[in-house]
Amino acid sequence: QHVAGVYYGDDSIISISHALLEIFNQMTIAKSMEETGHVYTDETKSGATRTHKRLDEVTFLKRSFKNVGGKINAALDVDTITEMVMWKRKGLTDQEAVQQTSSHAGFEAYLHGKGFYEWFTKQVNGKLDSLGLNSGIATYAEYEKLECRFLSTFTSDTDIMAHLTGR
């Protein structure tokens, strides 16, 4: 009712209602963990120096939370997206690798909004065109349709959380 969290190894993201923030927060969690011999740090590994942060100040598993067109996207770190298209898995042809990697990177770029998406796809498509390869990156509108189709499979925010947490 007042606390929801997602945990992956030593990474976590926790939402705490304002009603509890005075007694249960990042600082009190760090203090309790210290008493059991564990060190609790925020995502910057600088320690817990504040009781809480706004969602737009948090990262989790290399994702930050961006308001794009009135919805919050869990956007992958830009450096990670740009690095994705620089690597090739063994056993794939150049075209297979490009199709696989660039379509995934294109969707990740889409989550940052149209400005970054257009810059990113222009860079990738320009380079691939010069090599005679086709990126397979969908248009921004196609990613919008794909996202709408995916989100329409859920009937509530609870369904989405259950999908994300595997419960």
Language model features with spans:
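Active-site and adjacent loop segments of nucleotide-processing enzymes
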Residues: A19-K31, E35-V39, T49-R167
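Non-transmembrane, aqueous-exposed alpha-helical and coiled segments at domain scale
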Residues: K45-S46
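Catalytic palm active-site di-aspartate
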Residues: Q1-H18, K62
